[in-house]
Amino acid sequence: MPRQPGHNTVECIQAMLAGEVQVFIGLGGNFAQATPDSPRTRQALRNCALTVQISTKLNRSHLTMGRDALILPCLGRTDIDRQACGPQAVTVEDSFSMIHASRGQLEPLSTQMRSGQAYMYS
């Protein structure tokens, strides 16, 4: 894991456009569509040597990629996440701003699927 502070969203886009960032890793979300200037963000993503999207489902950001690209499917919060240390949970916020643990109830589509966190820590 990085030991120094990274970029915020705007700084990341500027660094990609300037060629200072060559790899983009998106953990969930729809980065290109969620930023204030989507056309500029799409150009920044195209400037990357590699874009990696770790996602539960396809979205528009997957259509804009760097020179090389990976789309890695990951478990959603409804999927059971079994790790060597035991079953895992994610936190969710309800409409009353209360945080709860959510454990999936569905068998994953494949034994090869991992959670987004498992991709980051393996």
Across the structure, where does each feature detected by a protein language model lie?
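Non-catalytic alpha/beta scaffold blocks inside enzyme catalytic domains
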Residues: M1-S122
